[in-house]
Regions:
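Bacterial N-terminal signal peptides
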Residues: 13-25
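Helical hinge/lid and interdomain linker segments adjacent to catalytic or ligand-binding clefts
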Residues: 31-32, 37, 41, 76-81, ...
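Bacterial N-terminal signal peptides that target proteins for export
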Residues: 2-15
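Hydrophobic alpha-helical segments
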Residues: 23, 49-51, 180, 185
Length: 220
């Protein structure tokens, strides 16, 4: 028994160092700070990381107007790994460093704020199903950022699906059913003729004689 106590005494300092290192490392790794200023390596992927953490059930602080609208995430090893995978610049900061940032943001003269994000919104984009992601700037950006979205069009709107989504993106739609501004230049182009035919077929499918009647109903 005495030998056991002697051995424990010999390793006492080592045990203290190991325990101290464990608690110290956890203390310093409290937040993942994602800057959104010119130093960020991939801004779109950074937005995707913020969205992804919300999907994982975590919260995310959006630091409005602080270094370009940065993000602060709870430190979780999986989150750090995902930043590395997606090529997003980040820093691991302590509670103390985060407190200094929030104090700076809270200054009366600072045009900044902290917005706590708690839920990943369900996103819908109003766009024809025939379009590919790279045909549309919005879907191209969302696809690159790895932010999930659903394409909806007239059929889904008429069915009442809008209530399924938290956020809807509309392009510069006029809902007149006039087939857009390209008529004069492209009315004989194959892709334009196909778009017109698809629009007319869709209107008939939904019980309308004219595309303009369908678009009017969708707008309501």
């Amino acid at each position: 028994m005495q030998q056991i106590f002697l051995r424990l005494k010999q390793y006492k300092n080592l045990i203290i160092v190991v325990l101290f290192s464990f608690f110290f490392n956890n203390a310093i790794a409290s937040y993942i700070f994602i800057p959104m200023d010119e130093g960020q390596t991939d801004h779109l992927k950074a937005y995707g990381i913020a969205f992804w953490t919300l999907e994982k059930g975590s919260t995310c602080d959006w630091l409005l107007n602080y270094k370009g609208g940065s993000f602060a995430l709870p430190y979780i090893k999986e989150f750090e790994k995902e930043c590395l995978i997606r090529g997003v610049k980040y820093e691991v900061i302590t509670d103390g460093q985060m407190a200094k940032i929030t104090a700076e943001i809270a200054e009366p003269t600072a045009n900044m704020d902290v917005m706590r994000l708690e839920k990943a919104p369900k996103i819908a984009v109003y766009s024809p199903k025939s379009k590919l992601p790279w045909d549309d700037a919005v879907t191209l950006v969302l696809t690159y950022a790895e932010i999930p979205y659903t394409l909806i069009y007239d059929e889904e709107v008429m069915r009442g699906d809008l209530g399924l989504y938290d956020w809807l993106h509309l392009h510069h739609e006029d809902f007149t059913g006039q087939y857009g501004k390209f008529y004069a230049s492209y009315k004989y182009a194959e892709w334009y003729v196909n778009d017109v035919q698809n629009a007319e077929n869709n209107a008939k499918k939904l019980g309308f004689d004219k595309v303009s009647e369908l678009k009017s109903a969708v707008a309501q």
